[in-house]
């Protein structure tokens, strides 16, 4: 059914199509083989029939970009063993694929600090409940500016997230077979590759400005990885017959009323 056909029968049409496409980072190398949108991977392991039914899990070191619950969920699936997921309703084809998962290191990157992370306390703590995963945070990444301190005062959830991250940073190294590193103040600037495939992700070290924002320091690091998952948000897709601003990723509107042109 087209929008024009619906207009013949309805006085108003509400478009609640959501944002389903993975946002891109806008950096060189995103088209190399081994780059994935988190939403695509979530669709795979949730068994969504609109997504791939098989997945390349040959990467031993993986980068996950983003510091929200989606990035945690993707990291958890990559770091856990397939057998640990049998208590869930994991589809058979996903279990079979994850049995072949070779990931031993998962590196999560956020360009700002702990107080700006969008994790929920429960999700962050659950990450550490698996006996096969060691969550690692560099003590040097536990840093706060004035705005960060105020954010902790203003929201208990933010303070709990910071406390959990601090506890990860303070403990002694463990012997779990899978390592999950959470890196703050690292802004991805390029995905590197050879022969068309991901070989590393390059980040720039950032520092807090005092208001919760960050500035690049000009110090760069290349992290050897064979796959990159971006969990940096979702982008709405256009609807046939409705104007769409690709730059702003919105339907041109006036107070919510879609403009004809």
Q: Where are the regions a protein language model picked out?
A:
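Feature captures the FAD/FMN-dependent oxidoreductase FAD-binding
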Residues: 1-32, 183, 189-202
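Core beta-strand elements of the Rossmann-like FAD/NAD(P) dinucleotide-binding domain
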Residues: 5-12, 57-59, 215-226
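Structured loop/turn residues at beta-strand edges in well-structured enzyme cores
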Residues: 8, 30, 57, 101-104, ...
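Glycine-/small-residue-rich beta->alpha transition segments that form the dinucleotide
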Residues: 12, 16-23, 30, 39, ...
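Glycine-rich dinucleotide-binding loop and its adjacent helix/turn
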Residues: 22-100, 246-260
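FAD-site-proximal beta/loop scaffold in flavoenzymes
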Residues: 33-52, 191-197, 209-261
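Dinucleotide-binding/catalytic capping subdomain of oxidoreductase cores
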Residues: 72, 76-221, 252-257
């Amino acid at each position: 059914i087209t929008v024009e056909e619906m207009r013949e029968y309805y006085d108003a049409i509400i478009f609640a199509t959501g944002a389903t496409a993975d946002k891109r980072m806008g950096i060189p190398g995103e088209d190399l083989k081994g780059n994935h949108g988190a939403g695509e991977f979530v669709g795979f392991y949730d068994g969504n029939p609109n997504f791939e039914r098989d997945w390349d899990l040959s990467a031993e070191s993986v980068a996950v970009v983003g510091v929200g619950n989606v990035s945690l969920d993707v990291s958890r699936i990559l770091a856990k063993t397939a057998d640990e997921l049998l208590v869930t309703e994991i589809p058979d084809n996903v279990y079979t694929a994850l049995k072949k998962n070779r990931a031993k290191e998962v590196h999560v990157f956020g360009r700002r600090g702990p107080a700006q992370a969008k994790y929920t306390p429960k999700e962050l703590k659950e990450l550490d409940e698996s006996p096969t995963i060691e969550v690692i945070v560099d003590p040097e990444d536990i840093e706060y500016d004035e705005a960060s301190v105020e954010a902790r005062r203003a929201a208990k959830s933010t303070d709990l997230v910071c406390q959990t991250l601090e506890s990860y940073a303070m403990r002694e190294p463990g012997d779990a077979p899978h390592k999950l590193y959470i890196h703050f103040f690292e802004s991805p600037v390029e995905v590197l590759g050879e022969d068309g495939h991901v070989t590393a992700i390059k980040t720039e070290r950032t520092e807090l400005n005092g208001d919760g924002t960050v500035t690049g320091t000009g110090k760069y690091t290349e992290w050897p990885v064979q796959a990159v998952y971006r969990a940096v948000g979702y982008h709405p897709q256009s609807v046939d017959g409705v104007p769409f601003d690709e730059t702003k990723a919105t339907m041109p509107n006036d107070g919510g009323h879609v403009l004809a042109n």
